[in-house]
Amino acid sequence: FILWFGWYGFNGAACTTIEDLGSVFLTTTVSPAIATVTCMVFTWIKYGKPDVSMCLNASLAGLVAITASCDVTDAAGAIVIGIVAGLLVVFGVWLLDYKLHIDDPVGAVAVHMMNGIWGTIAVGLFATSKAPGYAIAIESGAIKAEGLFYGGGFTQLGLQLLGFVSVAAWAAVCMTIVFFVIKATIGLRATEEEEIKGLDICEHGLTSAYAGFELGTAGMPDITYEDVVSVGSESMENSVPAMIKTSDIPDENKITKVEILMKQ
């Protein structure tokens, strides 16, 4: 929500009239709101309850998607842009996580890349002369015509697609070179050991970089890695370090309480 609040300044900073500013604030509100509701309804139907984390990503996706066209589209265009953004982030995360098996724990590709592409294309579909910022955009040469769905034909849509392909090609070439250099020098991925321990402690020497998420040790017994419980056919070296504490409950209850403390 801090991002959402800041997005009004991000999108509205260049406005020169109150009418243009009001229109930008409207579209910047409508698109993420619709994206959030769309994602909530979809995940509610699919999983039986709303996915809060996914819905918050949908809010950000709606903001990303509306940015390119925020000053040249109207509320109707913002609604459609938001609906697509809300669905796109869900299917994008599913595609990356479950089909392509790409490590993207925060859904950045689905939120920013996919919806950035969608938002860029949306200008060629929903740009309208009814928006206060349209005349300024035409005068400055930022756009050439109305969007396809507002009677402008394929002119602006073609320009938006050309812009997308150009940026994608430039980024792909440059970042491929950069990533190969990183891989050949300091390494591109964290080791398996670093992933298990956490990069906060390996890279920065911190138990956790987030307040409230530190490992709690007060009142807990020391757990040493010599105390190992072997489970199944795994070797002792690969077993989970643990301490098992057993305390009896009065005999009349006929049960035994077992507490297992594990340090991961």
Summary of predicted features, one role per range:
Residues 1-264:
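Glycine- and aromatic-enriched membrane alpha-helices
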